Amino acid sequence: MNSLVATPPVPPHFYENSRFSPSRMMSTPSSSYSSRKRKADDDNDHDGRMSASPTNSPAFTPRQLPHSYRNIKRSRPNVSGRPLSLPRLLETLDTDALRTVVRTMCERHPQLADEVVHTSPRPNVSSTLQVLRNYQAALQSSFPLGGNTESDYAYNRVRQPLTNLLDALSDFTPNFLPPNESQASTSLSYLDGATDIIHALPRWSTPQNNIERDSAYDEMCKAWILVIREAAKRGGGIQLQYGGWDQKLAKHNQTSGGKLQGAVNELGFSLGWMNGPDTPSHGANSEMGSIRDQLFSGTYGLGTPVKVGPW
């Protein structure tokens, strides 16, 4: 009878709790906290060893920044646009632009013209002749391609560059003449180069078109005569004779077709060696010239016998 009585069922959670091990059941929160703390301490020790290892390495040398450097903060410039200063602006200008600026300033302020003239360096022979050659190059480049270069059509095409060259030649020449130029060698050097430029002027088939070229020769001949006369007053014309100017001027006269004959005659008269019917003292002048040559060459008196003994 009693065996037929059913045993009351046991709840399922009692069976689950019975599976846990005693050690699991006996673990307390304090033991879990201590294990976590020990693990954190081990991690901190490992990090400390890792951070300290480079310092103890012999290859690492700590560098200390200066105290003043650490306190200085790099200033950030305030970037903004501004115009160039006058010296930097002048560096960017080429010759033509700078010349235009100076000319414009002198036109606006006439009182600056004298200041510019006195401040500017005096032009030399080489720079002046180069300016004239530039005008000459512009003239040559203005000729039409093909056709007759001596025709009226070619003359009309190059008339303006030709006028520019002749005007420049007329303006520059007085600057190298006495009394503005006191050195005869400088004047003669300029006239030598300027005469070569006139030789290179084109010849035209129409005689009327050659009037400008002939006028340039006439002005150049007068300039030669003026310089020769002034040079003859200094040292008896020694610089004219021993500079080879007699030969240079004779060659210029030949190239010009005799248009510089007046200058050749003036040079011959100044040196005293001109051969012509209108020089009555030709023999005396030749003798004086011969003595002068011997004096400068150091051969004077070499052929004269020297007396020995009482005079």
Curated annotation (Swiss-Prot):
Keywords: Cytoplasm, Nucleus, Protein transport, Transport. It comes from the Eukaryota. The keyword Cytoplasm applies. Residues 18-34 have a biased composition (Low complexity). Its main location: cytoplasm. One of its GO terms (biological process) is protein transport. Residues 1-83 are annotated as: Disordered. It is found in: Cytoplasm; Nucleus. Pfam families: Cut8. One of its GO terms (cellular component) is cytoplasm. One of its GO terms (molecular function) is proteasome binding. Binds the proteasome. Involved in ubiquitin-mediated protein degradation. Regulatory factor in the ubiquitin/proteasome pathway that controls the turnover of proteasome substrates. Targets proteasomes to the nucleus and facilitates the degradation of nuclear proteins. Belongs to the cut8/STS1 family. This is Tethering factor for nuclear proteasome sts1. It comes from Penicillium rubens (strain ATCC 28089 / DSM 1075 / NRRL 1951 / Wisconsin 54-1255). The lineage of its organism: Eukaryota, Fungi, Dikarya, Ascomycota, Pezizomycotina. The gene is sts1.
